[in-house]
Amino acid sequence: MQLITERLFLIPLQPDGMRTLLARTTDPELIQPYTDMLDLSLAHPEQWVWYTAWGLYQNDSGDWVGDLCFKGLPENGQPEIGYGLLPEYEHQGYATEAVRAACRWAFEQP
């Protein structure tokens, strides 16, 4: 599964991808949230895409731009999303583009 936008493709990370992300994470503030995402995605295999991180990659280069996550299943039809970008990709509209695509996808789900 992937979502494609004008400049990005978004892929929900499988458990191995989450483990790789955790191993590469140097920001101590992200280790626990990423660990929680991995644990919750494993605990909810039928709805794992709502609990895992989604990698954000540039369409043209395939470079990692950042990630976003849903904070579990939407409550009352309203998804909650968190996101982070590498500093060199901030202030260029990537987060807006990714969040729009993720919300569009979320609202299409039953």
Q: Where do the PLM segments sit?
A:
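GNAT-family acyltransferases
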Residues: M1-E80, L85-E88, A101-Q109
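Glycine-rich acyl-CoA binding loop
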Residues: G93-T96
